[in-house]
């Protein structure tokens, strides 16, 4: 169960940052400019509200968090409430932690296959190479608002049916990411306080 949950965290973080990178161009946001602008991103930080709808639950599950990303290969994806957890990536090394009994505890879940796929995808997305994705096909709609549609290929569609990245009117920012999952489940992530190409301490990627 934990392994499935962490697989979802890995994919959510990768897709979310890919969306933020894609949103860099100005209001026209044509596909060529989206790809070209990806190379200009050095860092991203943002806060988010995640709302997950499950068929078995009447009310959605709400989570709040934040993330920090460096183009050099570092990522911190952190849930702040209702439960605290964090994924730290630095290069090829990924560590997963949850906060329990007043302390951070490292997860022993391997999720090797998911990690490998996500890292491979991220390396392509950050360069604007959406066409080279091995696990998603893509389509772009200029809108307004502009949208990037990602459709999973065979294998990944076991737990993700489709992803829609909705671009904001504000250049450099996306409005939300909507993820459709099997069993009439869905996840929606809305962003606020997005900052691009800002500085933050490298220790954010070393410890919870």
Say what each PLM segment does:
Residues 21-28:
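Boundary at the C-terminal end of the N-terminal hydrophobic targeting segment
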Residues 9-20:
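Bacterial N-terminal signal peptides
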Residues 1-5:
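N-terminal secretory signal peptides that target proteins for export/translocation
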Residues 130-208:
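Gly/Pro-enriched, hydrophobic low-complexity segments
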Residues 29-53, 58-60, 98-156:
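Flexible, processing/modification-adjacent segments and terminal tails
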Residues 49-51, 72-74, 80-82, 92-94, ...:
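Solvent-exposed coil/turn segments that connect beta secondary-structure elements
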Residues 42-50, 63-67, 73-77:
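One face of beta-strands
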Residues 66-118, 187:
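An acidic-aromatic
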